[in-house]
């Protein structure tokens, strides 16, 4: 019973208690007869249909399954889970358009509020009854409401911070110390050169194909600031902004000069796994990467972190950090909105949130849970010092209709199939 209380506070079930109270009143007034009460017990079991962004064999799924069992035990309402994996981003809208019954789903919280918004219910009323804003990182609440034009359309969970994650053992093997941790682009290049010239045989950096936008997005935002990156994309002024080419030159040099692994950009997750396999020292990724790499490679090396460095004469420095989360959303046509919200809330807060943190070494979503996993310890001070939250790819994906074209050109740039001039020219001609 104690464990159940930890997961489900009375406050969370206020709506259920209210429903039971109304039912008691109906019995008291004779509005429901004894025979009718017999029929009530025969009503078919209610259920919430939840489409999940996780695969059923992932550790997140284990935590969610346990939460679903606890929810059903507490309420009598089952949670029917369909494990869709990351492909949910393209599967969910056609399914809802076809009239499929889905009450709850999850995806990246920015994508939830921006791309899936027309399918989502506003959650503020339900959130206020449980004082939800007390449990959520202010920066995440501000971001998700901003994307929702003031509406709360998604409940962030499993927050992340994005920056350069490095294998501390390999860092030392290449002759580097804590004093070498770079805060400027020039110092990062110096570190890369030092690793390349060492006897270690290590690649300085690595990356996967789907994350090359992080490299260019961060570098461009360092020069311009995130807002101007979004303006550049909206107005398609690539050829008029010299920093756009400068950032492309910078990222291309990482590959051209041999600072990136020869296999980069690799097919995910082969690139990031090189850090665990003892082949590459650094990778620009989200805070899920230490856990993913450890699980995939069996490495027990320790991890360090630093923000993407500042550029000379740039607008933003290391105070600009890409942060985000996954997000639960309740569908606007659901007949089980309150129940779906209650179930999602039970995962985002309290004991289940800590179980998720422990299972995948992620940042706690509930601000009451203050203990970060040891593997992410180096990122804690930077999260606290962050004053400019960046969205995913620092604004490079601000226009959903345009992001695939940018990604395609970035792959050509990083595969050295085109020059920086050609990169800018091709992007200039795309709108």
Model-derived features: where do they sit?
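Extracytoplasmic/periplasmic solute-binding protein
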Residues: 149-157, 162, 172, 187-236
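Short, solvent-exposed loop/beta-turn-alpha elements that line the ligand-binding surface or hinge
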Residues: 124-139, 181, 205, 223-246, ...
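Glycine-centered hinge/linker elements that transmit conformational signals in sensory
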Residues: 190-194, 233-264
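A structural signal for short loop-to-beta-strand junctions that line the ligand-binding cleft
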Residues: 103, 130-171, 203, 315-320, ...
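Extracytoplasmic/periplasmic substrate-recognition and gating elements
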Residues: 46, 69-74, 78, 97, ...
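Hinge/lid segment of periplasmic solute-binding proteins
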Residues: 39-42, 108-163, 189, 304-306
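Extracytoplasmic "Venus flytrap"/periplasmic binding protein-like
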Residues: 70-139, 173-175, 180, 274, ...
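C-terminal capping/gating helix-and-loop segments adjacent to ligand/active sites or protein-protein/ligand interfaces
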Residues: 147, 322, 360-370, 374-431
């Amino acid at each position: 019973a104690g464990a159940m209380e930890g997961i489900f506070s009375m406050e969370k079930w206020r709506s259920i208690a209210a429903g039971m109270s109304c039912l008691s009143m109906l019995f008291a007034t004779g509005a429901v007869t004894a025979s009718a009460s017999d029929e009530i017990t025969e009503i078919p079991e209610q259920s919430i249909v939840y489409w999940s962004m996780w695969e059923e064999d992932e550790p997140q799924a284990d935590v969610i399954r346990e939460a679903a069992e606890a929810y059903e035990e507490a309420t009598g309402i089952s949670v029917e889970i369909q494990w869709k994996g990351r492909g949910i981003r393209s599967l969910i809208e056609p399914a809802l358009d076809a009239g499929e019954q889905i009450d709850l789903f999850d995806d990246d919280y920015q994508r939830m509020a921006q791309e899936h918004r027309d399918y989502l219910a506003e959650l503020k009323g339900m959130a206020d009854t449980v004082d939800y804003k007390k449990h959520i990182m202010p920066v995440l609440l501000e971001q998700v409401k901003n994307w929702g034009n003031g509406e709360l359309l998604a409940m962030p969970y499993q927050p992340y911070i994005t920056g350069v994650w490095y294998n501390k053992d390999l860092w030392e093997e290449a002759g580097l110390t804590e004093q070498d941790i770079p805060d400027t682009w020039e110092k990062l290049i110096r570190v890369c050169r030092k690793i390349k010239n060492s006897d270690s045989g290590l690649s300085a950096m690595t990356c996967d194909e789907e994350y090359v936008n992080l490299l260019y997005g961060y570098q461009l935002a360092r020069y311009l600031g995130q807002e101007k990156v979004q303006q550049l994309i909206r107005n398609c002024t690539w050829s008029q902004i010299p920093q756009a080419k400068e950032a492309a030159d910078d990222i291309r040099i990482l590959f051209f000069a041999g600072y990136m692994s020869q296999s980069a950009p690799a097919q995910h997750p082969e690139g990031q796994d090189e850090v665990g396999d003892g082949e590459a020292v650094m990778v620009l990724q989200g805070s899920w990467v230490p856990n993913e790499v450890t699980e995939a490679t069996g490495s027990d090396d320790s991890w360090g972190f630093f923000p993407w460095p500042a550029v000379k004469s740039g607008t933003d420095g290391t105070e600009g950090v890409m942060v985000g989360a996954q997000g639960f959303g309740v569908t606007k046509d659901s007949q089980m909105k309150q129940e779906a919200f209650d179930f999602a809330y039970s995962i985002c807060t309290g004991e289940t949130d800590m179980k998720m943190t422990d299972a995948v070494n992620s940042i706690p979503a509930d601000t009451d849970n203050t203990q970060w996993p040891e593997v992410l310890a180096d990122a804690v001070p930077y999260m606290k010092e962050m004053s400019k939250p960046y969205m995913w790819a620092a604004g490079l994906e601000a226009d959903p209709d345009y992001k695939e074209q940018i990604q395609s050109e970035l792959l050509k740039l990083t595969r050295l199939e085109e020059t920086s001039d050609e990169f800018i020219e091709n992007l200039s001609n795309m709108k």
